[in-house]
């Protein structure tokens, strides 16, 4: 098939509403370590700085800024502690377990697109895929379980450097288009 175009989607905030999952897990994670629960505006303001795409790092940064702003002597938690707390809130258990065992905030997510969108794109010779900072189990859950997509083209956490680095987008575009992008060597 000769493609007429290519669309690479983010997942969070584009394919699924994560305000009652990732964002809620961020709020509750921060609260569990410093007793302060940031607002959605606090979270958005930090995300808008452009470097806090990873919610674990975002949570840690919110804790650090709060404790500094309030002159607290609280020692920030280790990143591993943030990951463990966040994961328990978000998944409700281990993310590698079967989806049916998940009981966390991930169950609150609503789909923002019509399930037929991707077949419509394919029918119109438009290639598509996903580039997300989400963990692989979370990304696959929404794409395969909620949207019923079979092996969707996906670059997720750990597959490429974190956004805003464009490497994940470039790699997936090259794979889908089957040619190298960029300037000639």
Language-model segments: residues:
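Hydrophobic alpha-helical core bundles mediating ligand binding, dimerization, or RNAP-core interactions
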Residues: 22-26, 30, 63, 138-143
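Helix-loop "lid/cap" segments that line or gate small-molecule binding pockets
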Residues: 27-33, 56-72, 172
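Short, acidic loop-to-helix structural element flanking the phosphoryl-transfer center
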Residues: 3, 8, 88-130, 134-144, ...
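Substrate-recognition "cap/lid" segment bordering the active-site pocket of phosphatases
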Residues: 129, 134-185
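Generic non-transmembrane alpha-helical segments
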Residues: 25-33, 85, 89, 101
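Non-catalytic pre-domain segments flanking phosphatase-related domains
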Residues: 1-9, 68-80
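Active-site neighborhood of HAD-like aspartate-dependent phosphohydrolases
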Residues: 1-45, 51, 57
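Alpha-helix termini
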Residues: 67-73, 118-119, 174-184
């Amino acid at each position: 098939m000769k493609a007429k175009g290519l669309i690479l989607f983010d997942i969070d905030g584009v394919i699924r509403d994560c305000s009652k999952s990732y964002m809620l897990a961020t709020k509750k994670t921060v609260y569990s370590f410093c007793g302060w629960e940031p607002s959605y505006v606090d979270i958005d303001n930090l995300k808008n700085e452009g470097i806090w795409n990873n919610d674990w790092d975002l949570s840690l940064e919110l804790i650090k800024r709060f404790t500094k702003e309030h002159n607290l002597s609280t020692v920030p938690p280790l990143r591993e502690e943030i990951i463990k707390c966040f994961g328990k809130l978000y998944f409700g258990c281990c993310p590698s377990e079967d989806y049916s065992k998940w009981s966390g905030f991930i169950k609150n997510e609503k789909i923002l697109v019509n399930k037929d969108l991707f077949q419509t794109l394919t029918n119109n010779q438009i290639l598509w895929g996903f580039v997300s900072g989400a963990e692989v189990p979370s990304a696959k859950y929404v794409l395969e379980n909620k949207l019923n997509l079979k092996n969707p083209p996906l670059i997720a956490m750990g597959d490429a450097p974190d956004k805003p680095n464009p490497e994940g987008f470039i790699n997936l575009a090259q794979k889908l288009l089957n040619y190298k992008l960029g300037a000639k060597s």
